[in-house]
């Protein structure tokens, strides 16, 4: 186990190098930088001032020199200074994490509470009205884009009924209701279909028939055996969703002005704020590697027959 965990952490190094290098290259290929976005290119500011500012930030250096300087800063705990705000990148990024963490926890909780019971119900009521109705709901939820759901909820609950604020501050549960519902609609629809399919597959297995023959109640079989066997699929979905949510949901955060990591990333990309963009890239890489590692460990805990690829230490 220890060797496996160490191996996965070591795998993070080439992943980070590859991802950061590619993102650095793509931003340069884009053809403009933060100075162009800040001062414009219409001649409003003297070219000498623009060149001096670009030299001050090191943007006049060769690409490889800039990249190595940034990597060296990371290794010493310095992620640089934001080109636009002038604030420390690490502090700026960390200040946005609480809002993203709050939205992640609420969205996952809402999704689990909606999708698992409904998915199980649809499987138990297979090919009956309840099943058809829930499958229709799932189809609609999967078909609607997040931005449309967000605007619809905002129109109804914020503008028409004035129950929730139009603009969220990213710190209170009340302001998180609409962003959470928006995310939960699509996620619940997807989860419900997967839970239904997995539970339905388990219900048709021989051990379920054997338990029924021994007189075990259907509800006990469902919640203690079938659902436990279905947990691997649910954990996989949760892992993917947690990774994307912790990376910030750019569209939803931008619509609701939710002051989280996703909105920060959009603003940084728009303004070509390289240090902030690179901080976001590193964060996403770390999140997905860690989520995948935790998922593998949970797989092994739930089903010891699953091997982790190395001998146990």
PLM segments and residue spans:
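Hydrophobic alpha-helical transmembrane segments of membrane transport/permease proteins
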Residues: 16-65, 162-178
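Hydrophobic alpha-helical segments of polytopic membrane proteins
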Residues: 6-8, 13, 153
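Membrane-water interface segments at the C-terminal ends of transmembrane alpha-helices
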Residues: 22-29, 58, 72, 136-165, ...
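An internal, D/E-rich "acidic patch" concept
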Residues: 59-116
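Membrane-interface helix starts
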Residues: 10-14, 63, 105, 277
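Peri-membrane helix termini and adjoining interfacial loops of integral membrane proteins
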Residues: 43, 151-163, 254-262
């Amino acid at each position: 186990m220890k060797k496996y965990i160490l191996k996965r952490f070591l795998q993070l190094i080439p992943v980070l190098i590859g991802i950061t290098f590619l993102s650095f290259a793509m931003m340069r290929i884009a053809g403009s930088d933060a100075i162009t976005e800040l001062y414009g290119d219409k001649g409003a500011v003297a070219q000498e001032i623009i060149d001096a500012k670009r030299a001050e930030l090191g943007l006049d250096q060769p690409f490889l020199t800039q990249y190595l300087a940034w990597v060296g800063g990371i290794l010493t705990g310095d992620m640089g200074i934001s080109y636009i705000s002038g604030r420390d990148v690490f502090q700026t990024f960390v200040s946005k994490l609480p809002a993203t963490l709050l939205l992640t926890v609420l969205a996952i909780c809402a999704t689990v509470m909606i999708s698992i019971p409904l998915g199980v119900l649809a499987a138990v009521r297979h090919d009956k009205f309840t099943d058809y109705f829930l499958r229709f709901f799932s189809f609609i939820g999967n078909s609607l884009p997040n931005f449309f759901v967000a605007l619809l909820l905002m129109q109804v609950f914020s503008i028409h009924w004035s129950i929730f604020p139009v603009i969220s501050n990213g710190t209170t549960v009340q302001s998180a209701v609409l962003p959470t519902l928006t995310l939960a609609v699509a996620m619940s629809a997807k989860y419900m279909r997967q839970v239904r399919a997995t539970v339905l597959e388990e219900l048709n297995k021989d051990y379920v028939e054997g338990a029924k023959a021994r007189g075990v109640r259907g509800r006990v079989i469902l919640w203690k055996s079938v659902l436990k066997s279905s947990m691997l699929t649910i954990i996989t979905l949760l892992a993917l969703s947690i990774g994307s949510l912790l990376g910030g949901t750019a569209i939803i955060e931008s619509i609701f002005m939710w002051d989280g990591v996703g909105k920060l990333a959009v603003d940084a990309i728009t303004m070509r704020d390289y240090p902030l963009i690179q901080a976001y890239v590193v964060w996403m890489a770390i999140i997905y590697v860690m989520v995948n590692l935790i998922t593998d460990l949970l797989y092994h805990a739930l089903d010891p027959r699953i091997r982790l690829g190395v001998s146990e230490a």
